[in-house]
């Protein structure tokens, strides 16, 4: 058994890519896998990220970039896109409330007046077959910053959904980085028996708060990815992975 505070594991960080993947001398043996959704199971670059950019551009009248978006996403407390866009707009000199940011964001995300929303651009990054394989070996759960409505829209027809024991959305628990959602999933069980896989600083902070080991998804080439890698190392990530399926390189077979 291993624990989050074990420096031997925390110092052993891997970045899996399309090239050679280093052999794991210390593979891990969790019993429970907990996944974030956005950036882990679902590609949200054309949906949530784009909606955030369009919201800031629309309300501020200024041209903003994905590089700026990543700087804001890397700040603790900004896993909530509505809170992030409100803070971003205010910093640009256009004071914006949470409710105004959310209302504008959702117009781009869901669409209005018969105009399709960006939500239709969402793409799943993991196949149901891979989820089924993991489900044969581990208990699977989800802890996401999505609302229940957003989660259901994307996952209601996905065959992999049935394999998750529990799904905790932002409607069910306090927002990340609060670890309440992870603790609800554990339900008194040993945190060291789990592994949380996420792509956001708030995911890592929630894992640390719940004393759950953490693996970070960091796609090479994304704006600011080197800075995010360094920050995840500081927070004790067991591994840095290019994509969720690289988790297979980390787990004991």
Language model feature labels by segment:
Residues 2-35, 87, 96-100, 252:
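Non-catalytic pre-domain segments flanking phosphatase-related domains
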Residues 28-37, 41-127, 149:
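N-terminal helical cap/lid subdomain that shapes the substrate entry/recognition surface
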Residues 41, 140, 196-197:
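Conserved SAM-binding loop
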Residues 59, 128-141, 145-175, 180-189:
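Substrate-recognition/cap helix-loop segment adjacent to the acidic, metal-dependent catalytic center
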Residues 139, 193, 213:
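Residues at the starts of beta-strands that form the adenosine-phosphate
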Residues 196-238:
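Acidic, Mg2+-coordinating phosphoryl-transfer loop and its flanking beta/alpha structural elements
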Residues 239-243:
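Short acidic-hydrophobic, aromatic-tinged amphipathic segments that line or gate anion-handling sites
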Residues 247-253:
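Short amphipathic alpha-helix with an adjacent loop that forms part of the alpha/beta core around
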